[in-house]
Amino acid sequence: MGWGWILLFAAGCAEIIFALSLKLNEGFTRLWPSIVTMISGGGSFYLLMMAIKTLPLGTAYAVWTGMGAVGVAVLGIFLFKESADWWRLASISLIVLGIVGLKLTDIE
């Protein structure tokens, strides 16, 4: 796995933190969650920008958004008691399958 994929993974993690902190900052009325939102959002975009220097743009963007969607959906189930019905879990599984498929197309 090259640096591009490592940076993309870090960007995806920062994206998950960004999205979760959006919920916690309550419209930017809470200081620390608001600071985390700004830092993680900026960091996520910066890391994505660095990753697309070596990865195909379409692949990198799809993986980044997919990671964010899956991470937030799964953590939403555990942290915010969001629905975990079988349709939602099946949909999350399809996103994961798509991410794996995109990674497999970039084998060096």
Model-based region annotation:
Residues 1-108:
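Polytopic alpha-helical membrane proteins, predominantly small-molecule transporters/carriers
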